[in-house]
Regions:
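Mixed-charge, low-complexity interaction segments
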Residues: 2-247, 312-329
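Short Fe-S-cluster ligation motifs
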Residues: 293-306, 325-335
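Short, charged/polar micro-motifs that form catalytic or ligand-binding hotspots
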Residues: 29-37, 252-255, 283-287
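Histidine-centered nuclease catalytic patch
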Residues: 264-295, 304-317
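Hydrophobic/aromatic-lined pockets within catalytic cores
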Residues: 52-55, 255, 270, 284, ...
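Short cysteine-rich loop/turn motifs with clustered Cys
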Residues: 245-275, 297
Length: 335
């Protein structure tokens, strides 16, 4: 098992030694070196996702759709900037611009599923075309630059046609590349994944995606220094993973014995008709600790969103409920 030390003190990408002898792994590692924009990470991540589903041939369009789906939650839910802002206040990253454009076109929620996002992208295909095409200008070619150093021939970065031909020649005569490109133009341009690279990626999907996420988080944190716990904001967290169901069972036991009033409405919380949610929104504290979780009217949960509650009208009621929670668990061993 060969290890690639990423950024020396960072994530170690582990690839089976067999592939070290048959593929140019160092060139693969270079695919995320010196990015100018975040969508370089999402490009490789989308490719790995597609290959893990045994997709051998795709297009720029399909890859970019996957990129939008993968970045959607971070941008929409937490307003994360993928590559910072320009001096004039405009968004720098083309992928982020595509997401913001789709937001204006549709009523798709921040926590929409991948399938829902892909369906809406297709619905607004014409409107998104120009924004998506901007993402194809350099990254698909620059991502392979780490392999080009093996060739004495220099790449002509000024011509897509000549770059496509150059990539084909490198693949045929110098070293096998993860993908080559077809002759069509724009978003319809074909992407062909090499079978041996597909096998390597499928055998090492978890390690590779872990490495991509590590590099992505480093980049995003540098561009969003004010955002805490950014690693938890890349995708919606599964409620089972967060174990909120256990907290709900605890409150359910208390509701069988005592009256608990909703912090916001003052009305009694009824068994099986409430949600467990955070008093201080999860995006601020980045944890699901018991002190911050409370039962509340399920009809109000969505409108509460990620806004901080006003202190004076609500904290006293919240504190009284929390006191009841801890008092009840001490006095009733069955809860």
């Amino acid at each position: 098992m060969a290890e690639r030390d990423i950024a020396k003190a960072g994530y170690q990408l582990k690839i089976d030694g067999f592939y070290e002898n048959t593929l140019e792994i160092e060139g693969f590692v270079q695919m995320m070196k010196d990015p100018s924009y975040c969508y370089k990470f999402y490009w490789l991540e989308a490719i790995v996702d597609l290959i893990s589903r045994d997709v051998a041939e795709t297009t720029f369009d399909e890859i970019i759709n996957e990129m939008i789906a993968n970045a959607w939650y971070s941008v929409r839910e937490f307003h994360i900037h993928l590559s910072g802002m320009r001096a004039d206040g405009l968004v720098r990253d083309g992928l982020e611009r595509a997401i913001l454009q789709l937001t204006k076109l549709s009523d798709l929620p921040a926590n929409a599923s991948r399938v829902e996002i892909l369906n809406v992208i297709k619905e607004y295909d014409k409107e998104l075309k120009q924004t998506k095409e901007q993402l194809t200008h350099m990254v698909p070619y620059r991502a392979l630059a780490g392999f080009f150093s093996k060739s004495e021939e220099k790449a002509d970065w000024g011509s897509v046609r000549r770059l496509t031909e150059y990539i084909y020649r490198i693949n045929q005569t110098v070293t096998v590349l993860p993908y080559t490109l077809g002759e069509r133009s724009g978003l319809k341009k074909e992407v062909y994944f090499h079978p041996v690279w597909m096998k390597m990626i499928q055998d090492n999907t978890v390690n590779i995606l872990g490495w991509v996420q590590y590099e992505k988080v480093k980049w995003l944190q540098n561009n969003n220094p004010e955002v805490p716990g950014l690693i938890y904001k890349l995708a919606p967290m599964d409620e089972k993973m967060r174990k909120l169901s256990r907290v709900r069972k605890l409150w359910e036991g208390i509701l069988q014995l005592y009256e608990v009033r909703d912090v916001y409405t003052g009305k009694p919380v009824l068994p099986n008709q409430y949600d467990v949610d955070h008093f201080i929104p999860w995006s601020f504290v980045m944890n699901d600790e018991l002190w911050n979780l409370m039962p509340m009217d399920s009809s109000l949960n969505s409108s509460k969103s990620n806004r901080l509650p006003k202190w004076d009208p609500f904290f006293k009621a919240f504190a009284e409920n929390q006191y009841l929670l801890y008092q009840s668990t001490q006095e009733n061993s069955g809860i």
